[in-house]
């Protein structure tokens, strides 16, 4: 049995293509059952996020499985195969295992190290388990992917540093103030960057958030998201002294905060330190503000420097993660190969043993003058012959199993000797390997 992965991601398809092939998370039963109804697809899992759509299957027919998934994606979403095909990638065997392990470990994410993708794959697996479209192979495969991702997070620092400007701003604030639990943040602007920064500050336990914007309604809307306080733009400097951290990102063409403004604010704060973060381009805050006593000002260049340094650190950590994945691929591939090989070896030996016993019984029944130890000696002789005959094919199967190329040998033996290997044998092996 083979694992096949077909999909597309932010690396291969624009958002307008990705949204056309996305699956609604609350309506996964229909597509999952449709996949299982397709010829030669034994198990199926669908992962659908804003940045990727992937289908994982187990099948005996690699090329056919890939083609059928591609056709399924096009037909199910009503997209021309000619339009969809250029954006799709397809993997099988070790490449498929590596791909999913990397995805689960966030090495293939838009932001390397982000934690969301692992939860999204777990959710996808949950749907497959609920609707019984995953079985022994994909169950084991995805549980292994989860454990690999955990190892990567535990044994590397891939998720420990900021790689977005908004998160870098929070990281700098923590370096200056340490604990943020008694700090209040003022957001000047209500755009995407301010919203992201607000989320990071809230996640780091700030005491409160104030939001101001030239359009007061937008300030109210963003403040409501974080149980914050909206501030009229006209009241900015009346309220600014209440903020320990000020993050500004507006579309202004001139400075909106100048040194004289901040000097007055600091006096009202009785010289308590303030941290200003200017992520606007053009800048919102006059650089000379940094000269005011007990004021710390950082702009986009400062933050980009933090991000660049952290990206380099993550690149180094990613190398360690790849080494972990290499190690885990070998272990899983061995299990997958043995899943095919072991039941076949058991069935082959059982077939030979049944034949040996049947023929030996016939011989013993018709042998009139059998010596006293004759039956014992014939038992040993026939057993030795069977073992010698079976040693070469058994050794070969085990060897090719370690190399990962088992299907041709397994299929040949099953056909030549008319072997029957039940699903229970495979399940038993799976349980023993857990």
Swiss-Prot record:
Pfam families: GlutR_dimer (PF00745), GlutR_N (PF05201), Shikimate_DH (PF01488). PANTHER family: GLUTAMYL-TRNA REDUCTASE. Keywords: NADP, Oxidoreductase, Porphyrin biosynthesis. NADP(+) binds at residues 189-194. The active site is at residue 50. The keyword NADP applies. It comes from Geobacter metallireducens (strain ATCC 53774 / DSM 7210 / GS-15). HAMAP family: Glu_tRNA_reductase. This is Glutamyl-tRNA reductase. The gene is hemA. Possesses an unusual extended V-shaped dimeric structure with each monomer consisting of three distinct domains arranged along a curved 'spinal' alpha-helix. The N-terminal catalytic domain specifically recognizes the glutamate moiety of the substrate. The second domain is the NADPH-binding domain, and the third C-terminal domain is responsible for dimerization. GO terms for molecular function: glutamyl-tRNA reductase activity; NADP binding. During catalysis, the active site Cys acts as a nucleophile attacking the alpha-carbonyl group of tRNA-bound glutamate with the formation of a thioester intermediate between enzyme and glutamate, and the concomitant release of tRNA(Glu). The thioester intermediate is finally reduced by direct hydride transfer from NADPH, to form the product GSA.
